[in-house]
Amino acid sequence: MTFPVEKVRADFPILQREVNGLPLAYLDSAASAQKPNQVIDAESAFYRHGYAAVHRGIHTLSAQATESMENVRKQASRFINARSAEELVFVRGTTEGINLVANSWGTENIRAGDNIIISEMEHHANIVPWQMLCERKGAELRVIPLHPDGTLRLETLAALFDDRTRLLAITHVSNVLGTENPLPDMIALARQHGAKVLVDGAQAVMHHAVDVQALDCDFYVFSGHKLYGPTGIGILYIKEALLQEMPPWEGGGSMISTVSLTQGTTWAKAPWRFEAGTPNTGGIIGLGAAIDYVTSLGLDKIGDYEQMLMRYALEQLAQVPDITLYGPAQRLGVIAFNLGKHHAYDVGSFLDNYGIAVRTGHHCAMPLMAWYGVPAMCRASLAMYNTHEEVDRLVAGLTRIHRLLG
């Protein structure tokens, strides 16, 4: 069955607008995806008709808002096939989720002389928290290097592990290269050394189904805004055995059981002890609507359509004069490139004049830029609402830029 891309596009009001007098071609969903009416309407309806502070309220609005919030927790647990909804923590996004693990589990379990393994393709959100933890604890940060094609040099991975390796923190899909890492093999190797595994799933969950039980990872984190949901909300999955042992990393309301000026404070049970303060309930409702939306379309159908579009885009872009494409042939979501010796910002500015939105810069992956020896790249990302015609416009725009700039 043909993927109903035009029907999908009709659900996204922003795709109807023009930029610089031309129809918007939004090729920046890896940075943040646009929102369908179903998400916008769900969050708006909550604020119009159902808003109240959650937890402890005895009045109807509070009870209903709390129930709605907890229903999304259950919904998200089914979305990634967690054993229990109580293994899921609401966070502001992937960055906060990783920092939570670093500051809670990491503070308790990392000692001087231990080591943590990451890769050279990580987003800064999966580098900097571990650098900070290692500096604080006197631990070592080890790095899996890259092959020129943008895949990890997995033949080096076994040598990085030893009996002091405590954590493998790895991206599921690179936000620059689109590389999907072979998580089952990597996780199996980590298990041989007794190491825990954190997976940054920010660039994966919108492209295909994720099963955290099948992966057997200890932590999995993703952001709602890349999944066609609101900003400021995400999900951190923590395997239950670890969750119960982890102390809170922020203090305040909602995460306590009792507070006494003389007897100290006791914590709420997990996951609520990791959710200090008033939550982003509207964002949670919107996230639930986003999960409903992609589930109704079918992640397998979304993935098949996006892969067809990706193959077409790579074939067409390869014909642009003087273009450099980065990353493997088999990839998800993104195409990073440079055009001749022109700075990515200049290329992106020209494309914007043509109504085409791409991301330019280091993409929060400065070590990866350094590996390739470039200050920046352009990145076009393909989502379920993008079309062959938009790919053609990108190719035509780049060809025109090459002709103008030489």
Swiss-Prot record:
Any one Gene Ontology cellular component term annotated for this protein: cytoplasm
Stretches of the chain forming a coiled coil according to its record: none
E.C. designation(s): 2.8.1.7, 4.4.1.16
Cofactor(s) recorded in Swiss-Prot or TrEMBL: pyridoxal 5'-phosphate
Location relative to the cell: Cytoplasm
Highest taxon listed in the record's lineage: Bacteria
PROSITE patterns, per the entry: AA_TRANSFER_CLASS_5
Primary localisation category: cytoplasm
Gene3D superfamilies in alphabetical order: Aspartate Aminotransferase, domain 1, Type I PLP-dependent aspartate aminotransferase-like (Major domain)
Chain positions found as N6-(pyridoxal phosphate)lysine: K226
Active site, UniProt feature: C364 (cysteine persulfide intermediate)
Pathway(s) it belongs to: Cofactor biosynthesis; iron-sulfur cluster biosynthesis
InterPro entries: Aminotrans_V_dom (IPR000192), Aminotrans_V_PyrdxlP_BS (IPR020578), Cys_dSase_SufS (IPR010970), PyrdxlP-dep_Trfase (IPR015424), PyrdxlP-dep_Trfase_major (IPR015421), PyrdxlP-dep_Trfase_small (IPR015422)
The reaction(s) this protein catalyses: (sulfur carrier)-H + L-cysteine = (sulfur carrier)-SH + L-alanine; L-selenocysteine + AH2 = hydrogenselenide + L-alanine + A + H(+)
HAMAP family, per the entry: SufS_aminotrans_5
Protein family according to the UniProt entry: Belongs to the class-V pyridoxal-phosphate-dependent aminotransferase family. Csd subfamily.
Protein name: Cysteine desulfurase
Organism annotation: Salmonella paratyphi B (strain ATCC BAA-1250 / SPB7)
